[in-house]
């Protein structure tokens, strides 16, 4: 049986930084209001770079670290809710940019759970024995999704990309997983309603900005997601004490505080970087993983047992436990 492992990690964010003080100049808010409620102090916002541009930079970093070219890749899976276009896919643009001419490429849409869903999918491709190497990237330009006059959402999000190189391995690294969706609660977090625009339809143009019922999403995270994480750990071959780090979607620092207590782990095992980047949706977990490797917290030598968990629109939530 074939197994998969994460062999390289990388991230990339736009150069421009927008602080809470900057936002206070264009909307009715201030640093204390934002940071005390979310933990966010700044975010990176693209001036000219598209979602595929950010993802391409990550792909180039991953290949450079591994010493490979695009021609050696079998697939590219790109998780995003802010694609350059619906067609062609953002992944196809990345494939062309890096010369990965034999790789199949597609986008995956699962909001802030997107990277976890994409990584789970990629692991199955390699486990089939038919594929050896692939890129899994989360990339977002959420600055184009928010209504910049709405302080309830605009202050939360940022742009960025992160990803991993997944390769075949002789040892098992993916230990447990749980992927979930609940479409009955889909309206509490929405973006990109396109509506019907034909001359034969009776539908008016829809509001396409990102909309969120913050309280409902907060409660969902600390109730449903925390319960799912605990269940995934219970059904895995490890104990909660075996986990070195839990890398959770970076939505809100208060969510992480409550999740740590619910799961029963030390808060220090839940690294956070939303203060620097805000909520980057599908990019948040791989950016955090890349930073943990850069900081020496995760040596990327197979010695650490790490839990990844994303949660967001759909509603969707997913957890992976793996050795890295």
From Swiss-Prot:
Residues 250-254 are annotated as: ACP-binding. The keyword Cytoplasm applies. SUPFAM superfamilies: Thiolase-like (SSF53901). One of its GO terms (molecular function) is beta-ketoacyl-acyl-carrier-protein synthase III activity. Pfam families: ACP_syn_III, ACP_syn_III_C. The last Arg residue of the ACP-binding site is essential for the weak association between ACP/AcpP and FabH. Catalyzes the condensation reaction of fatty acid synthesis by the addition to an acyl acceptor of two carbons from malonyl-ACP. Catalyzes the first condensation reaction which initiates fatty acid synthesis and may therefore play a role in governing the total rate of fatty acid production. Possesses both acetoacetyl-ACP synthase and acetyl transacylase activities. Its substrate specificity determines the biosynthesis of branched-chain and/or straight-chain of fatty acids. This is Beta-ketoacyl-[acyl-carrier-protein] synthase III. The gene is fabH.
């Amino acid at each position: 049986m074939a197994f998969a492992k994460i062999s390289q990690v990388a991230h990339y964010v736009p150069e421009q930084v927008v602080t809470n003080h900057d936002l206070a100049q264009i909307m009715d808010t201030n640093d204390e209001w934002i940071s005390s409620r979310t933990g966010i102090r700044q975010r990176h916002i693209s001036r000219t770079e598209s979602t595929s541009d950010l993802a391409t930079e990550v792909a180039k970093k991953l290949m450079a670290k591994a010493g490979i070219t695009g021609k050696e890749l079998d697939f590219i899976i790109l998780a995003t809710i802010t694609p350059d276009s619906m067609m062609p896919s953002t992944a196809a643009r990345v494939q062309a940019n890096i010369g990965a001419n034999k790789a199949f490429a597609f986008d995956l849409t699962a909001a802030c759970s997107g990277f976890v869903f994409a990584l789970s999918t990629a692991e199955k491709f390699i486990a089939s024995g038919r594929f050896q190497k692939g890129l899994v990237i989360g990339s977002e330009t959420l600055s184009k999704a928010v209504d910049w006059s709405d302080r309830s959402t605009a202050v939360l999000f940022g742009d960025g990309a992160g990803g991993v190189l997944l390769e075949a391995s002789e040892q098992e690294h993916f230990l447990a997983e749980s992927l979930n969706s609940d479409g009955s609660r889909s309206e509490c977090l929405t973006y990109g309603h396109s509506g019907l625009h034909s001359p034969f339809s009776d539908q008016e143009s829809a509001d396409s900005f990102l909309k969120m019922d913050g309280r409902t999403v907060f409660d969902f995270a600390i109730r449903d997601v925390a319960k799912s994480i605990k269940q995934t750990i219970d059904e895995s071959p490890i104990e909660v004490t075996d986990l070195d780090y839990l890398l959770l979607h970076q939505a809100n620092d208060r969510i992480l505080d409550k999740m740590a207590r619910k799961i029963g782990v030390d808060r220090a095992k839940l690294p956070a970087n939303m203060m620097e980047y805000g909520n980057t949706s599908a990019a948040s977990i791989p950016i955090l993983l890349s930073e943990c490797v850069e900081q020496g917290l995760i040596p990327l030598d197979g010695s650490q047992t790490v839990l990844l968990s994303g949660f967001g629109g759909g509603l969707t939530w997913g957890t992976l436990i793996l050795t890295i």
